[in-house]
Swiss-Prot record:
Top enzyme class: lyase
Lineage start: Bacteria, Pseudomonadati, Pseudomonadota, Betaproteobacteria, Burkholderiales
Organism, as annotated: Verminephrobacter eiseniae (strain EF01-2)
The EC number(s) this enzyme carries: 4.1.3.39
Disulphide bridges: none
InterPro entries in the cross-refs: 2-IPM_HCS-like, 4OH_2_O-val_aldolase, Aldolase_TIM, DmpG_comm, DRE_TIM_HOA, PYR_CT
Family statement: Belongs to the 4-hydroxy-2-oxovalerate aldolase family.
The protein's name in its UniProt record: 4-hydroxy-2-oxovalerate aldolase
Length: 344
């Protein structure tokens, strides 16, 4: 199947998913500089919030350097052609957060739930549509649901008013074939006018391949991050995706060389550590574990002497999902006790 001439919308994750490896401590100056670089490179949609979305600032997820309001207020007036989006997880973010984001000029709201819990998104999706926002239903940890279950959940979100649905590989666990079956099933079930997106992680080095597979199966919005800055081994690396799309004749509107410069000159220098597929990030993908668990598991390793890899495998075995970061500490303590590293 040729994709030559196909148009997609690339959605940048550097300033939202990239907050995870930065422990949510990105400065306003870093946000503004990178946002301007992305805007100048032609990226049409840029996500800006705490890594866990609007209202994510907490003991459980981490306290950011600045509030969502401050980050959004700093970035939105600066971008010339790009629109700004925000992520919202019901139960973390509220309708009041949504109103605040809309008031500041956020164009797109992405309402995220676990892939089998679309029903908790109804209030937020309906409210966002009432505000006439570009409203996205974001189904996380998509590897944990069958294609049939996923399309059922996607139709719920579409019914609430979402004009775009995302198949989200939060764990970086899917392979091109499993991406195609899920994205293809959802595409077939949705109305033709409802857009379809894919969000990948690079834990098995499949970010770009999976994104291309998603485009082949009918997705037209694709998430990526400059230099891959994101949870785990990072998001699909934007500069690589853009180069591959260019070679395949897929139109993105993003400048191949300018996005490379953003990645190399602006994003890599602010990394606290290299975003790469180390054994722990690889374990996330292999075991199908939520990407933002990585740093929590590494911290628990330091505290309890249980290897992060073992903790992550156990989290996968227990079927833990996004939002259960507090269980990492609990799991590490239990494992340390069982191994005689901690007094009972």
């Amino acid at each position: 199947m040729t994709l030559k001439g196909k148009q997609i919308t690339v959605h940048d994750m550097t300033l939202r998913d990239g907050m995870h490896p930065k422990r949510h401590l990105m400065t306003l100056e870093q946000m503004k500089t990178i946002a301007c670089g992305l805007d100048a490179a032609g990226v049409p949609l840029i996500e800006v919030t705490h890594g866990d979305g609007l209202g994510g600032s907490s003991v459980n997820y981490g306290f950011p350097a600045h509030s969502d309001e401050q980050y959004l207020s700093a970035v939105i007036p600066l971008v010339k052609q790009a629109k700004v989006s925000a992520l919202l997880l019901p139960g973390i973010g509220t309708v009041d957060h949504l109103k605040m984001a809309h008031g500041l000029g956020v164009h797109t709201i992405r309402v995220a739930t676990h892939c089998t819990e679309a029903d908790v998104s109804e209030q937020h999706i309906r409210f966002a549509r009432k505000l006439e926002m570009d409203t996205v239903g974001f189904l996380m940890m998509a590897h944990m649901a069958s294609p049939e279950k996923l399309l059922e959940q996607a139709k719920l979100m579409e019914g609430y008013g979402a004009n775009c649905i995302y198949v989200t590989d939060s764990a970086g666990h899917l392979l091109p074939e499993t991406v195609k079956t899920r994205v293809g099933a959802v595409r077939e079930a949705l109305k033709p006018e409802t857009e379809l997106g894919f969000h990948g992680h690079h834990n098995l080095a499949m970010g770009v391949a999976n994104s291309i597979a998603a485009i082949e199966a009918g997705a037209n919005r694709i998430d990526a991050a400059a230099a891959g800055l994101g949870a785990g081994a990072g998001n699909t690396p934007m500069e690589v995706l853009i180069a591959v799309c260019d070679l395949m004749g897929i139109a993105t509107g993003v400048d191949v060389f300018k996005i490379q410069d953003v990645a190399e000159d602006l994003v890599v220098p602010i990394m606290d550590f290299p975003i790469r597929i180390d054994r722990d990030a690889l374990t996330l993908g292999y075991a199908g574990v939520y990407g933002s668990f990585l740093l929590f598991a590494k911290r628990a390793e330091q505290k309890y002497g249980v290897p992060a890899r073992d903790i992550l495998v156990e989290m996968g075995r227990r079927g833990m999902v996004g939002g259960q970061e507090d269980m990492i500490e609990d799991t590490a303590m239990t494992m340390a006790r069982e191994r005689g590293r901690l007094a009972a």
